[in-house]
Amino acid sequence: MTYIVALTGGISSGKTTISNGFKKIGINVIDTDIIAKNIIEKNLQVSFSIKRKFGKKILNIDNSINRLLLRQYVFNNHHHRLWLENLLHPKIYQESKHQIKMTQSNWCLWVVPLLVEKKLEKKAHRILLIDTPVKEQIKRTVRRDKISFLEAKKIIALQSSRKTRISLSDDIIFNKKNFKKINLYIYYFNLLYSHLSRIYNKNKTINIKKNFLTKFY
């Protein structure tokens, strides 16, 4: 059975940088954002439902769905956001399970930004959190997505708090400005998770306390 490490963190925390680092050393990465993107773009039934629900306001000139506009639109409406989540999340989870099952590396990295919000923490054997100060998240989100300060603040307010994410995580990388030692992080955690994977596949149990934290600051 595949040993699953869930990578999570708030918006603009640096999850992609870390997941790409693991990918470069051969770890299978299952990214729910990429899965969601593929479902929206390639599942005709899903794309038709979204277009019918939200109309032209979330479309590009070529009639394809603009995911950034879609995200901004649903964040402003609780009912629309729930509708979209109910449409996408079951499909995202099913595809995640399929990709995890096909894993070839010693362990796999399951990238789930909404791990805590969707109460999926028990679906992974270990949780790695990328933790970032809220002010830094807002600044990065405004710069990356070209949205206003208030829009970025609203998105972050809808996510779980840093305190909640930290309380549920096993390992933490604190990313305030940049990853100066990213290769060290990747090297260390690959050794740790490969070791835990071997123990798990041999005994099916690992006697490490849930709140045993490995922190990198």
From Swiss-Prot:
One Pfam family per UniProt: CoaE
Keyword Transmembrane helix recorded: no
Keywords recorded for this protein, A-Z: ATP-binding, Coenzyme A biosynthesis, Cytoplasm, Kinase, Nucleotide-binding, Transferase
Residue ranges annotated for the DPCK domain, each copy included: 4-203
EC number(s) from the headed UniProt entry: 2.7.1.24
Biological processes annotated in GO: coenzyme A biosynthetic process
Subcellular compartments: Cytoplasm
One GO cellular component, as annotated: cytoplasm
Enzyme kind, highest EC tier: transferase
Pathway per the UniProt entry: Cofactor biosynthesis; coenzyme A biosynthesis; CoA from (R)-pantothenate: step 5/5
GO molecular function annotations of the record: ATP binding; dephospho-CoA kinase activity
Keyword match ATP-binding: yes
Binding site for ATP: S12, S13, G14, K15, T16, T17
Chief location: cytoplasm
Matching CDD domains: DPCK
Catalysed reaction equations from the record: 3'-dephospho-CoA + ATP = ADP + CoA + H(+)
Family matches, as NCBIfam families: dephospho-CoA kinase
PANTHER family tied to this protein: BIFUNCTIONAL COENZYME A SYNTHASE-RELATED (PTHR10695:SF46), DEPHOSPHO-COA KINASE-RELATED (PTHR10695)
Family, per entry: Belongs to the CoaE family.
Function in brief: Catalyzes the phosphorylation of the 3'-hydroxyl group of dephosphocoenzyme A to form coenzyme A.
Name of the featured protein: Dephospho-CoA kinase
Biological source species: Buchnera aphidicola subsp. Acyrthosiphon pisum (strain APS)
